[in-house]
Regions:
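Active-site-proximal beta-strand elements of phosphoester/diester hydrolases
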Residues: 3-16, 117-127, 155-159
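A short acidic, helix-capping loop that chelates divalent metal ions and anchors anionic groups
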Residues: 15-20, 92-94, 129-132, 164-168
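Extended active-site neighborhood of metal-dependent phosphoesterases/phosphodiesterases
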Residues: 64-149, 175-191
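Divalent metal-coordination and catalytic microenvironments
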Residues: 11, 52, 57, 70, ...
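N-terminal active-site segment of His-dependent metallophosphoesterases
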Residues: 1-69, 73, 165
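Short coil/turn segments at beta-strand junctions that form active-site/ligand-binding loops
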Residues: 3, 48-50, 79, 152-153, ...
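Active-site-proximal segments of metal-dependent phosphoesterases and phosphodiesterases across multiple
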Residues: 18, 152-192
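Flexible, glycine- and charge-enriched loops at secondary-structure boundaries
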Residues: 20-30, 60, 132-140, 171-175
Length: 192
């Protein structure tokens, strides 16, 4: 298997400019992270990254202004950034800013990215009306077809953990169809 460096971030919880969250400015913290990432993983670094994946809770309240701030900040990355939705995200507001991201025909933000190291599968677990996650039959069917089509190693990304994390707050909002996900993955478990 080929090696590949990438950056993974999650739970940015950005708010509209000028607002704070628990006394902190999430955008300021993300700018500092991007600066560090560019220094450590930019094209001239010892370990340059091919891309970044941010696995959800991009915005705390799902505000358009927070997504606009995110778009502005990640422009500073010297490589592509793949975004997923989390339980705090609002699909319509997100897509109003990031309309060019890969989506399914049903509007779910997910994709399969072929890399020299394998297939990076990014799943949308955002479910309207709940903080819990769900894939549903359509997304699971797409995942199954993707896994059947490819024989490459698979790297799976999603916001909601498919197992109990031991963190009470997270375990209260589980991936509701985790068992169905495990059944979908089972025939391919040696590659994941």
């Amino acid at each position: 298997m080929n090696t590949l460096s990438f950056v993974h971030l999650t739970d940015l919880h950005l708010v509209a400019p000028g607002q704070s969250l628990y006394g902190l400015d999430p955008a300021e913290r993300l700018r500092a992270a991007v600066h560090s990432i560019c220094r450590r993983h930019g094209p001239d670094a010892a370990a340059p990254a091919a891309f970044a994946v941010i696995t959800g809770d991009l915005a705390h309240l799902g505000e358009v202004a927070a997504y606009e701030s995110l778009a502005d900040i990640i422009k500073g990355l010297p490589f592509p950034c793949h975004l997923l939705l989390g339980n705090h995200d609002e699909r319509e507001a997100f897509l109003s800013v990031f309309g060019g991201v890969p989506t399914t025909p049903e509007g779910h933000v997910q994709q399969a990215l072929s890399t020299p190291a394998g297939l990076f599968v990014m799943l949308d677990t955002n479910e309207a009306g709940t903080h819990a996650g769900k894939l549903g039959e359509e997304r699971l069917a797409r995942l199954s077809a993707t896994l059947e089509y490819s024989t490459d190693p698979v790297f799976l990304f999603l916001h909601h953990p498919p197992v109990a994390s031991g963190i009470v707050g997270m375990d209260r909002i589980p991936l509701l169809d985790a068992d169905a996900l495990w059944q979908t993955l089972k025939p391919h478990r040696q590659r994941i």
